[in-house]
């Protein structure tokens, strides 16, 4: 520990999650071969699909590289068989690739990049994603938008 390391919170009633002596703040990440830290999301965003852990952000990142997608958000929705499943809300681009975009094309793209349990069952197309004042997607507003 050095003089710049955080040792706790100012609220004495706040319960700390400690892992190996470190304070866990809920961020998920990994250290690459060059010792760079990559933050990939939040632990509370993780969903379980048929017993497998899936981080929706990984699906979002894969789809952000897909031709025809202007912007996209992946998240978990309840499922009676697998407890949860991946759903995707996509805003197509205005070009030919966006006009040709289909739910099956999105599923196929994810299937070639990630494990089967990460393939979205639900695909919704929107004109725009609902965002808050800081520009973050508001997931609770997505469930009532789009068509599968």
Over which residues does each language-model region extend?
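Adenylate-forming AMP-binding core of the ANL superfamily, especially NRPS adenylation
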Residues: 1-11
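AMP-binding/adenylate-forming catalytic core of the ANL superfamily
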Residues: 8, 18-21, 26-118, 128, ...
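Short proline/glycine- and acidic-rich turn/helix-capping motifs at secondary-structure junctions
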Residues: 123-134
């Amino acid at each position: 520990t050095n003089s710049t390391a955080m040792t706790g919170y100012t609220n004495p009633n706040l319960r700390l999650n400690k892992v190996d002596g470190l304070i866990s703040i809920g961020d998920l990440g990994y250290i690459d071969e060059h010792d760079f830290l990559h933050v990939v999301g939040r632990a509370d965003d993780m969903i379980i699909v048929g017993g497998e852990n899936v981080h929706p952000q990984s699906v979002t990142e894969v789809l952000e590289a897909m031709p025809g997608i202007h912007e996209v958000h992946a998240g978990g929705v309840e499922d009676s068989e697998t407890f949860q499943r991946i759903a995707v809300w996509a805003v197509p681009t205005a070009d030919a690739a966006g006009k040709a975009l289909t739910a099956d094309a999105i599923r196929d793209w994810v299937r070639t990049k990630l494990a089967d349990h990460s393939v979205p069952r639900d695909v919704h197309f929107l004109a725009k994603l609902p965002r808050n004042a800081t520009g973050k997607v508001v997931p609770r507003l997505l469930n009532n938008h789009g068509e599968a």
